[in-house]
């Protein structure tokens, strides 16, 4: 699985056990990702921060 990084055109191959890509952004600015990474369990969104997780290559 490869997940996008914050830098455009770069991606990261996920280590074993981390089979989700996620994108984190502030609810106030949904078009501007704050973090993009590999993760094992999708974090819960809050009032300020939203997480979008997926399990296909570069879907974040």
UniProtKB/Swiss-Prot annotation:
Disulfide bonds join 3-21, 14-38, 42-53, 54-59. The keyword Disulfide bond applies. GO terms for cellular component: extracellular region; membrane; other organism cell membrane. It is found in: Secreted; Target cell membrane. Expressed by the venom gland. It holds the Pfam family Toxin_cobra-type. Keywords: Cardiotoxin, Cytolysis, Disulfide bond, Membrane, Secreted, Target cell membrane, Target membrane, Toxin. Transmembrane segments: none annotated. One of its GO terms (biological process) is killing of cells of another organism. CDD domains: TFP_snake_toxin (cd00206). GO terms for molecular function: toxin activity. Belongs to the three-finger toxin family. Short-chain subfamily. Type IA cytotoxin sub-subfamily. Monomer in solution; Homodimer and oligomer in the presence of negatively charged lipids forming a pore with a size ranging between 20 and 30 Angstroms. Shows cytolytic activity on many different cells by forming pore in lipid membranes. In vivo, increases heart rate or kills the animal by cardiac arrest. In addition, it binds to heparin with high affinity, interacts with Kv channel-interacting protein 1 (KCNIP1) in a calcium-independent manner, and binds to integrin alpha-V/beta-3 (ITGAV/ITGB3) with moderate affinity. This is Cytotoxin SP15c. It comes from Naja atra (Chinese cobra). The lineage of its organism: Eukaryota, Metazoa, Chordata, Craniata, Vertebrata.
């Amino acid at each position: 699985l490869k997940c996008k990084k914050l830098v455009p055109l770069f991606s990261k191959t996920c280590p074993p056990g981390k089979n989700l890509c996620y994108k984190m952004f502030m609810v106030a600015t949904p078009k501007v990702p704050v973090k993009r990474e590999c993760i094992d369990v999708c974090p819960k969104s809050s009032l300020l921060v939203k997480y979008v997780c997926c399990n296909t290559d570069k879907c974040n």
